[in-house]
Each structure stands twice: as C-alpha cells, then as structure tokens.
Amino acid sequence: MEVLYSLSKTLKDARDKIVEGTLYSNVSDLIQQFNQMIVTMNGNNFQTGGIGNLPVRNWTFDFGLLGTTLLNLDANYVENARTTIEYFIDFIDNVCMDEMARESQRNGVAPQSEALRKLAGIKFKRINFDNSSEYIENWNLQNRRQRTGFVFHKPNIFPYSASFTLNRSQPMHDNLMGTMWLNAGSEIQVAGFDYSCAINAPANIQQFEHIVQLRRALTTATITLLPDAERFSFPRVINSADGATTWFFNPVILRPNNVEVEFLLNGQIINTYQARFGTIIARNFDTIRLLFQLMRPPNMTPAVNALFPQAQPFQHHATVGLTLRIESAVCESVLADANETLLANVTAVRQEYAIPVGPVFPPGMNWTELITNYSPSREDNLQRVFTVASIRSMLIK
C-alpha cells in the first residue's frame, strides 16, 4: 500500500511539474526520484482485473530513463516523459480499481489483488516512500492492529432511522403524545409532541428522551446543538405503527425546556450539558442521550390560548424539538464523510464494472446497512478500499 501511494505521489508531481519550459534544475530531484521508480519497476509484469466486468489487463515495464539537461525542458523531453507518466497512471488506476472490487472475510485490511500483493514485495522497497497521507498512516497502524485516528468532518456515523414512539395513543389517534425522530449521517433531529399541550401532565410538563447508540466511539467531537427540529415543524400525515390507518400531525412549535444532553462511553457519563446551545464539545462517547421538556405556557394571549384548548378537539399540536449535528470528530474506525468522495468512488467502480456481491459488503455498498452491522471484517475491508480510493483520487478525478 505504501508503494502504491509513493508511486502515485511521484506520478502526480511529475505530471504537474515536468512541463515544457521548466528549468531542469528546478525538477532535478523529482526526475531522479522518477528514474528510481522506473529502474525499480522495469522488468516486472503485472496483471489486473478479471473480476466482474473489469477486464483483464497485462502490464509490462520496460522504459528508458529521463536524461539530464543544462537548460529548460524542451517539447521532446516532456513528450518522452509524458508517455511514461500516462502508462504508469493507467497502471495505478487499474490496480486501484482491482483492489476496490475485492473483499475478504479474513484480514481484509491486507492487499487482496494480485498486483498490489506483488507491489508489497521486498524488491519495491527501493521506491521512495512518502507516507504523509492520513489514510496511509492509519492503514499502517490498523495493519499492525494498533490504534488509528481518523479526523472526519460530517461523519456518517448515524444509520438512517426515521420513526416515532407514542406514549399516549387511542384508536382515533386524536390525542397523541410521544416523540418522532430522524437520525442520518451526522445529524439527529428529534421532536416531542403532545396534542393536549401537557394539560393533564404533572405541573403541565411532559418529559421526553431520545437515546442514540453509535456503532463506533468518537473522540474530541465538535457538535452543534439547536433548540429546534425543523424537519418536524410542518403538518404531515403519518402511517400508524400497525399500518392500519394514518394520523394527522399539525405542529405548533414551542421552545424546549430543561434541555440536557449526555455523552456516555460504556454506560458512564463523560460530558453533560444543560440548557446550552450552539457549539459544544464531547470528549469521548459511544452513546448520546437527549432529555427535554414540553411545558404548557402558564400565560397565553387569547390567540395562543385558542391554539391549545382545555379539551378536545385538538387541532394544533404542541411540539418541541432538538437538532444535534456532529461537525467534526476523531474515530478509530474509517467512516464515510459527507466532505469526502471515497465512498462514492468505491461504489461507482463496483457498480460500473458489475462487481458481484461478496462475503463482506452489502449490495450496492448500502451505507445504512453497512454501518448498522459494522463488523470488524467490514471495518478492515473498508479501511483498505478507502485508502486505495484516496490514492486513486490523487491521479483520477
């Protein structure tokens, strides 16, 4: 994997910097590195593809070295270099696609394709190593079963979940109380509602709770907490739990009271915030617990009082909500990230070449299914294919 990254980094630099008119002295070190790559690769043969519709291709390396010059690089020099660069880039692209198409239930973090396994051989250690990539660094650690640490922005840590729980219900569905939520990606939105606006609750206060367990622990997370859940702020028709009927939800938004958010790790509270909105920090957690209240307003203007009558029918439904959004966090496991294209790149390659469903990844690389059942085998394979995708993205956009 390190060799693949070093090859890609060298090729990217060569493609960007070996251009007509450049002083040789400005790129002499790069050209020496490029020549070392050629010397190491010459005489070797590789094969890629042969899975799904990814065609089998054979690769032979027999290239001349780039020479020295006292002046600027001329058109012939650059054209000669370009021919070599383009062949190498095509090779790297196919090695990456071959690797992204494969998976293994055992030791899935290790190279799976024939070509990448061959590049891991001792003879290729002479290629200049550049391990500055976060993914390469963490792949090395994971490969040695040591602690990794990926920094994600907008991590897709929450499997998609949209549902409701009714704490008070009746066949007519005309006086309901409960919670509804939408968890997806890096965001939780939860709303507590009471058709009667807590008129019969103790002290006219309804208490709500929403607990979300993460599939992997996060550390040093920057989080935004808002006293609103905009996705539940407009009328809607909702299917009943048994699917036998539908019920009408017509929210009127109130501000939540006594809001508390707890971040827990292995059942122990690590951080707690009360009535604090905006940016908050969570040190280490695998569970989020949200507590909030709906309080019937003690004083109401006639217009507000008309919204919340003392008895049925209740045409407007008192609702309070919260939004919790993870802006950035560190995770020991690799995750999809809304700010990265790695999952999209891997999925696109597997779809384009009709890669058959294997023993590890779900059909279509369904992220909700993948993260819901995030096994060690999936984690290993995902770290490998994301590392390869990050390498490929240097050369192929």
Swiss-Prot record:
Gene3D superfamilies: 2.60.120.170, Viral capsid alpha domain (1.10.1350.10). HAMAP family: Rota_VP6 (MF_04126), Rota_VP6_A (MF_04129). Residues 62-73 are annotated as: Interaction with the inner capsid protein VP2. Intermediate capsid protein that self assembles to form an icosahedral capsid with a T=13 symmetry, which consists of 230 trimers of VP6, with channels at each of its five-fold vertices. This capsid constitutes the middle concentric layer of the viral mature particle. The innermost VP2 capsid and the intermediate VP6 capsid remain intact following cell entry to protect the dsRNA from degradation and to prevent unfavorable antiviral responses in the host cell during all the replication cycle of the virus. It is found in: Virion. Coiled coil: none annotated. The keyword Calcium applies. Belongs to the rotavirus VP6 family. This is Intermediate capsid protein VP6. Signal peptide: none annotated. GO terms for biological process: fusion of virus membrane with host plasma membrane.
